């Protein structure tokens, strides 16, 4: 089978190739969203792994999705003519990162931190419901800030604020991390 230079023969894909693709045209992101409902913690943590390409390479993104076990969703971003494979289910994110971690070079620190966050959530899960303590929640937010600092686009320019759900005091994560060190 003759391929166009940017096409990939699916039989030649490997974990190393996909990890290189993630390093170059992917992202490992942790975002914090304010919860509209009144839950115990005012923010929801979203963990995400993306693979992005120009829309003319949609087939490659679909091949990667299939190689990774059909996880995530392929989405089209019309305004920039992009397609992306978005993986945000925690279990799928964890499985993909564990599978690719030995081969990730540039985003290795983000991957390790995200796996640490996922481990904290898994340990705190009881009957499919998260039972994260307040201290674990603050630690997770600090790890999210580390990922944000490592990602060049966010650059950690905006510090996350941690709200104490009991007293509603605002404390910047830098202050919290200094207390945890000392």
Show which residues each predicted segment covers.
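Sequence-level preference for short, compositionally simple segments enriched
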Residues: 1-182
